[in-house]
Amino acid sequence: MPDPLRLPVFAAPMFLVSGPDLVIAACKAGIVGAFPTPNCRSIEQLDEWMTRIRAEVGTRPWCANLVTHSSNARLPQDLALVAKHQPPFVVTALGSPKPAIETVHAYGGKVIADVTSVTLAKKAIAAGADGLACICAGAGGHTGTLSPFAFISAVRAFFDGPLIVGGGISDGAGVAGAIAAGADYVYMGTSFIAAEESLAPVAYKDMLAAAQIEDLLVSAGITGTPASWLKPSLRDNGMDPDNMPDAPGRAYDSSQSFKGKRWADVWSAGQGVGAVKGTEPAAVIVERLAREYDAAQARLAARRERSLA
């Protein structure tokens, strides 16, 4: 895994939010930039994005996120471009990492599997994943249910490889806490939705800046998988947060609709949403996180010194 970085952070790959501008800005600021390949509506666009990212980040690490669910008919084409452009890290989501293993290992890359349970973590390692991204309670988008501290501890009982943890971490102190608990890296998503370089529309960024944790709802009623949605966005799309429907079948294709609305038009956020105060460049966000991270480490060191005095 990449060291040294300014911070042990991945700007999490976010659907319809993470594009080349955000990936490049994150990498240049000293963290790992990532994007989901389905954000590109064509294989030609994906080729263009990867070409640009690779040219602009140089030797800095970056990450492509593949959806390995059986509904992703474009996966073989995406994998062909992964082989061509060789992102150092490939995160697999919504399915087994197995389809990506041979391609990524052939050029020396690392496969990280998104997991939401200990059972899935064990399956991912058995399938050949090099590392795990543990998606915990508090994450935006498709979310988890486990405490990050409990999840880290449970995984570390059988796995000592690279471990990313994500879910509600919105400041540098949270990053330091996750590292102290045993994670190697942290996923941060919601904080970067409002970055100037993200693909999110202005209205989405404004909604984030106005939102608090109470404005979130976890529901499987949109895509069939539990996800954390912004209540104001649900209402804007004609849904009642207090009366959500039963979960449909899996609907990971953004063109699929719910009550006449594309589910991709419903906006999500994680429990760290209250930390978003407005739109900023990614570099400014990273620099603030770094100051907070350093301050948290200093507090821990000072507390230890006091306890030994």
Segment roles from a protein language model:
Residues 17, 169-170:
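Residue-level detector of alpha-helix initiation sites
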Residues 148-164, 170-309:
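Conserved active-site-proximal phosphate/metal-binding subdomains
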Residues 1-162:
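Active-site entrance/lid segments in N-terminal catalytic domains of soluble metabolic enzymes
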